[in-house]
């Protein structure tokens, strides 16, 4: 059973960080208009990615990301012109877990596109583990099969980011991971209001996290989850899957 009790000081620091992030989101939501119509990017896959990273590490995030996209595309019976956006690696630090996430996700989908849907989880996990060896940014190159199965069976593309995050939090009793998931969810909700080319928002988020007095390990987990979530937002061509109605 996971235990990683947070100190009163760290709980307070996390509460303040969330409050600061909500304030930043509110400013972007206020300015997010095109004429009189509000627009939002559909970034639900980032929730699966963040959950994979926080609960299992970088290799699990890549596996979860690839499976969530593949399964959702099949369920909606939509053929996309491209699985990926043109900006999949734009404005991402080449040494970051986010960059590694996008580059490796694209490689796996392109090389195994025809077999991914029916591929056993063990086989995908082995592919990701082998390919991860080339990426120093992926510190945990092992794929926990049980965590991956939980994420994919729980992921709901028709639910909100927050609903998915709340469901993923049930996988762990570790408050550090639960808090990191909460913060990744807040950031994904904020990213809905900015364009793919916008780097100002994520820069603001990272400055707030860096300045926060939360503990080193918690901060590292949060920053990795944010990097993967931001990368996911730039990766999957999710607008082509929005043809079917989704829950608000």
Show the residue positions of the predicted features:
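Membrane-engaging insertion elements
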Residues: 31, 62-127
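Membrane-inserting hydrophobic helices used for pore formation or membrane fusion
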Residues: 11-25, 85-89, 100, 184, ...
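Charge-dense, extended regions
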Residues: 186-248
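Membrane-insertive, amphipathic helical modules of secreted toxins and fusogens
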Residues: 108, 119-197, 203
């Amino acid at each position: 059973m996971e235990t990683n009790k947070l100190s009163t000081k760290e709980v307070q620091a996390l509460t303040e960080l969330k409050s600061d992030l909500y304030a930043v989101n509110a400013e972007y939501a206020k300015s997010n208009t095109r004429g009189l119509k509000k627009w939002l990017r559909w970034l639900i896959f980032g929730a699966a990615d963040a959950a994979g990273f926080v609960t299992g590490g970088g290799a699990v995030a890549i596996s979860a990301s690839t499976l969530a996209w593949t399964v959702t595309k099949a369920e909606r019976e939509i053929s996309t012109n491209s699985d990926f956006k043109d900006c999949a690696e734009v404005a991402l630090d080449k040494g970051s877990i986010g960059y590694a996430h996008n580059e490796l996700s694209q490689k796996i989908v392109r090389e195994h596109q025809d077999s991914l849907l029916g591929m056993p989880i063990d086989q995908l996990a082995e592919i990701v583990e082998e390919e991860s060896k080339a990426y120093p940014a992926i510190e945990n190159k092992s794929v926990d099969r049980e965590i991956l199965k939980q994420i994919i069976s729980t992921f709901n593309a028709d639910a909100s980011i927050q609903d998915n995050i709340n469901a993923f939090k049930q996988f762990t009793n570790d408050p550090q991971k639960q808090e990191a998931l909460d913060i990744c969810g807040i950031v994904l909700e904020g990213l809905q209001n900015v364009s793919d080319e916008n780097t100002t928002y994520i820069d603001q988020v990272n400055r707030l996290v860096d300045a926060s007095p939360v503990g080193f390990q918690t901060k590292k987990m949060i920053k990795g989850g944010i990097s993967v979530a931001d990368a996911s937002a730039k990766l999957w061509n999710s607008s082509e899957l929005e043809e079917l109605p989704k829950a608000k």
